[in-house]
Amino acid sequence: GHLLPMQIIFLRVLGTFVIAWGIQVSIKELRILKIERADYPRLILSSLLGVAINQMMFFTGLNHTTPVDAAIINSVNPILVLVFAAWILKERIGISRLGGILLGAAGALMLILLGNPLSLEGGNLTGDMYIIVNTASWSLYLVVSKPLMVKYNPIMMMRWMFLIGFIAVFPFSVEQALEIDFSSFDSFTWFSILYIIIGTTFMAYFFITYSLKRLSSSVVAYYTYIQPVLVA
């Protein structure tokens, strides 16, 4: 039941699109919603940053680095979002907000490093670079997509983002996806796949999309610091 990174990406992106599409077409109020042509460029960019690049860089990076290195690099996410939001959306960087994010970063790093000794092995450099691109891509996504999330329905946004994201990851993942032997999957493997698609992808993206409609990008990113607490 072992799956390669690109196989997981193929299944989770396609599965999430199917769920979002199914919900939208089954509800009349959502079925009639459209995205304005002027928003197409931002939609495409958001899809590439938040789905395609984010997913491929993260899983590829984990194959070449340690979870500790990945967690440390990801802890920079709220800081990058704060910078991008100030630059692109002209959000004000207040002293209290900056201080809170830096304090959260320090706390997250303490939890990560206390539970796992830091290893600065040269062999992790390639993987670390992938994770850096992943973190920068996700941070930029939270800022670039914000105007769309405020304007449109979350389910409709997810439908289109994951459709575009699937088109983008398809050339890189289809070869491995065709090699998946579904007949070898036991019940635990099927449960794991469904959990990845529904729990850690569809629900996670839905709540983030919903939150961006009501909160600033930097506040949404700030909740990244809850992850080390939950893991610990």
Predicted features by range, described:
Residues 38, 74, 90-110, 124-125, ...:
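Loop-to-transmembrane alpha-helix entry segments
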Residues 21, 47-52, 56, 78-83, ...:
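Hydrophobic/small/kink-forming positions within alpha-helical transmembrane segments
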Residues 20, 44, 84, 93-115, ...:
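Hydrophobic transmembrane alpha-helices of multi-pass small-molecule transport proteins
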Residues 1-3, 8-11, 15, 56-65, ...:
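Juxtamembrane C-cap of transmembrane helices in multi-pass membrane transport proteins
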Residues 2, 16-36, 106-121, 164-189, ...:
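Membrane-interface helix-cap regions at the ends of transmembrane helices
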Residues 19, 23-24, 28, 78-102, ...:
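C-terminal transmembrane-helix exit sites in multi-pass transporters
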Residues 25-69, 73-74, 110, 197-215:
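Specific transmembrane alpha-helical segments of multi-pass solute transporters/efflux pumps
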Residues 5-6, 17-20, 81-83, 119-177, ...:
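Transmembrane alpha-helical segments that form core, pore/gating elements
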